[in-house]
Amino acid sequence: MSRIGLKVIEVPAGVTVTKDGENNITVKGPKGELTRHFNPIIEMHEEGNLINFTRSSDSDRAMHGTMRANLNNMILGVTEGFKKTLDLIGVGYRAQLKGKTLVLNVGYSHPVEMEAPEGVNVEVPSNTNIIISGISKQKVGQFAAEIRDVRPPEPYKGKGIRYTDEHVRRKEGKTGK
């Protein structure tokens, strides 16, 4: 059983965590600022540069761990940031950037255009690699998943858009008689 909610979060130097009256927590750091609404059933306590969360009952255990993980991800985002890398594998598959619009040519009869959300940076170092970075783990991961969903990797030839560290399990083709 996980006990993530009980772990104490250490706030690094240069990062400020503030809570307003409506349970909105704002984290400011060298890379930017993130604000998120937190559930009032879990209480946040600050002691110097340490933050911990307490719950009133065991039925709130899942929310307890979720809130602790969300705040920790916000702190990591404003200090280090998050990055996802995708590879395009297939003949003629390529990506290019036009302003903030990512244009994908992945075997359809038309190019697929995707607008990057606010706070997410997209880089295309080569026409088969895409790097998505930002301070919000949720936005970076969501946009990377949306790009991957345009043409997910298929198991027979391995063609498609995949994360760089993703392993695609290959299948054997049909054997003829």
From Swiss-Prot:
Recorded GO CC terms: cytosolic large ribosomal subunit
Domain of life, source organism: Bacteria
Record's keyword annotation contains Membrane: no
GO molecular function: rRNA binding; structural constituent of ribosome
UniProt keyword Acetylation, yes or no: no
Keyword line: Ribonucleoprotein, Ribosomal protein, RNA-binding, rRNA-binding
GO annotation terms (biological process): cytoplasmic translation
Segments traversing the membrane: none
Family of the protein in this entry: Belongs to the universal ribosomal protein uL6 family.
Subunit organization: Part of the 50S ribosomal subunit.
Free-text function comment from the UniProt entry: This protein binds to the 23S rRNA, and is important in its secondary structure. It is located near the subunit interface in the base of the L7/L12 stalk, and near the tRNA binding site of the peptidyltransferase center.
Protein name listed in UniProt: Large ribosomal subunit protein uL6
Native source organism of the sequence: Latilactobacillus sakei subsp. sakei (strain 23K) (Lactobacillus sakei subsp. sakei)
